[in-house]
Amino acid sequence: KGAYVLMAFAAVCAAWFVAGLTDNAGLIEILAIPAVLGAAGTAGYTAYLFAQCEGRDLWQTPLLLPVLLAQAVTAGGASYAVMDVILDIPETDAIAWVLLGGVAATAAFVWMELASHGSRHVELAVETTTHGRDARQFWVGGVLVGMVVPAALAILALATDTASPALLASAGIAAVAGLFAYEDAFVRAGQSVPLS
């Protein structure tokens, strides 16, 4: 069933790409809602796949879906911010707000995830992430590069109302690099403890 979600989202993305190439704003408007639903469905399916690993307690948290949805928003805003360097993307303020909102939501959900108390295996995995072998990757890559830097750059871009896309593109690149660092640490942490 998840394959259908992925195929539908890929089809919507392909149609969006064609609409962009042909400068068909009407089709892009029609595809906006299916694109958002497809992105949310893809993030949801990813959470479902993690939940199938029942021996990995860290991946069973009820916050996993909200974290992945917030990360999907972050990745979408980051992608548009970077594309604005080579394409003329309208509404760059909206893109900055989407990126900032995604980063803020991701930070809030990650904090809730770390502050919550689960099983002993969850506690060990969180300890590995925040104070163990993955701590530098998590704090420097995931939090500083992936959350603090993009938020600061997006706020600066909104405050200065600059016409140059470089500032927001830098925020987007930092956000995606941080998402990678966080997710890598999250997956490693889940695997660092014995199966429950």
Give short role names for the model-derived ranges.
Residues 4-8, 12-181:
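Long, contiguous internal "core" modules enriched in hydrophobic/ aromatic residues
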Residues 53, 189-190:
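Surface-exposed loop/turn and secondary-structure junction residues enriched for glycine/proline
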